[in-house]
């Protein structure tokens, strides 16, 4: 999920930031709307960076790692050092399960696996997740530190964070 928590600034901040570059002040709402559309259409993004947004999001860890790789932001993530992680894992939909691409090392084939093969993959993933979480709980029950017990958890485990961008 993605939930907007808070924001600072808005349309007025965006248009004022854009107009400062040519010394113009406040205009009408209609002109402001036109300017915002113009900025978006022509990819003039710096005025939009004047607005600060804070989101609460939840996603599998492997998605989270890709997300922050491509965007500079401030974030506070749930910590497996301080919290017992919930048993919630990502299992891809059957139509998203495909073989490794033969010509793209980073991707998969465009055609999904057969429904039968996809069902088998989903069952194997679920079984692996259940076993990993069972081991995690057993380690915690033995008194192993959370920061060590969590290493058995797969990247498909869901995480959540507050993510702030400008």
Q: Can you annotate each of these PLM segments?
A:
Residues 1-166:
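Family-specific signature for flavin-dependent thymidylate synthase
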